[in-house]
Amino acid sequence: MTEQKVVIIDTGCANVSSVKFAIERLGYDVTISKDPQVVLSADKLFLPGVGTASEAMKNLEERDLINLVKQVEKPLLGICLGMQLLGKFSQEKGQKADELVECLGLCDGEVKLLQTGDLPLPHMGWNTVSAKAGNPLFKDIEEGEYFYFVHSFAMPVGDYTIAECDYGNPFTAAVQSGNYYGVQFHPERSSKAGAKLIQNFLEL
C-alpha cells in the first residue's frame, strides 16, 4: 500500500508542511520536489498553492514547472489555489488589474470571484460538499460532509465538476479532467473527511 512514490510539487507558493504531514499520517513517504525526473516518475502528485493566481503562475514559470505539470500522466491533485491553476484562466489578477491570468489549461474552467450575495469574502470555514455519485475521490465520504475552505475565487459549476458547495451561489468544490483532480477546500485541514479524501486519492 505504501510503496508508492508520492510527490508534492515544490511550487514555491505554498506551505506544504501540513499537506506533507497529512499524507505521512496515512503511512506514506512523501518527497517535495521540482526535479523533472522525480515529478514524472511519481505515482501520485500533489499541487498545493496559496496566494494569487498571477503570483503562482509566475512561480511555476520561473521554476520551469508549467510544461512539466502538463506532462504528468499519473493522478495529480491540486489543492485550493492548486485546483484553480488547473483551469484555463483566472480573474485573480494580483499586480495587474486589467487582464486575466492564463493558467495551466488542464481543465475547461475559468476561475471567477465568488458571487456571494450578502455573505462576506473570503469564504472561510467549514461548509458542506455535495459530490457526484460514484466518483472514487469521494468514496465512503458521506453526502453533505463538511470540509474547510479559505478562498474568494472559485470555478463555476461545469462539466468538469465532481463536487459542489454553496456559499451564496453554487461553485465547484472538486474537479476532474482525466488524471487531473482538484479540490477547492483544504483536505489536510478537514479532519476525518479530509484524511479519507487524501487516502482515496492515494488509492486511485
From Swiss-Prot:
The active site is at C80, H186, E188. One of its GO terms (cellular component) is cytoplasm. SUPFAM superfamilies: Class I glutamine amidotransferase-like. It is found in: Cytoplasm. GO terms for biological process: L-histidine biosynthetic process. It catalyses: 5-[(5-phospho-1-deoxy-D-ribulos-1-ylimino)methylamino]-1-(5-phospho-beta-D-ribosyl)imidazole-4-carboxamide + L-glutamine = D-erythro-1-(imidazol-4-yl)glycerol 3-phosphate + 5-amino-1-(5-phospho-beta-D-ribosyl)imidazole-4-carboxamide + L-glutamate + H(+); L-glutamine + H2O = L-glutamate + NH4(+). One of its GO terms (molecular function) is imidazoleglycerol-phosphate synthase activity. InterPro entries: Class_I_gatase-like (IPR029062), GATASE (IPR017926), Imidazole-glycPsynth_HisH (IPR010139). The keyword Lyase applies. Pathway: Amino-acid biosynthesis; L-histidine biosynthesis; L-histidine from 5-phospho-alpha-D-ribose 1-diphosphate: step 5/9. It comes from the Bacteria. Keywords: Amino-acid biosynthesis, Cytoplasm, Glutamine amidotransferase, Histidine biosynthesis, Hydrolase, Lyase. CDD domains: GATase1_IGP_Synthase. PANTHER family: IMIDAZOLE GLYCEROL PHOSPHATE SYNTHASE SUBUNIT HISH (PTHR42701:SF1). IGPS catalyzes the conversion of PRFAR and glutamine to IGP, AICAR and glutamate. The HisH subunit catalyzes the hydrolysis of glutamine to glutamate and ammonia as part of the synthesis of IGP and AICAR. The resulting ammonia molecule is channeled to the active site of HisF. Heterodimer of HisH and HisF. This is Imidazole glycerol phosphate synthase subunit HisH. It comes from Vibrio parahaemolyticus serotype O3:K6 (strain RIMD 2210633). The gene is hisH.
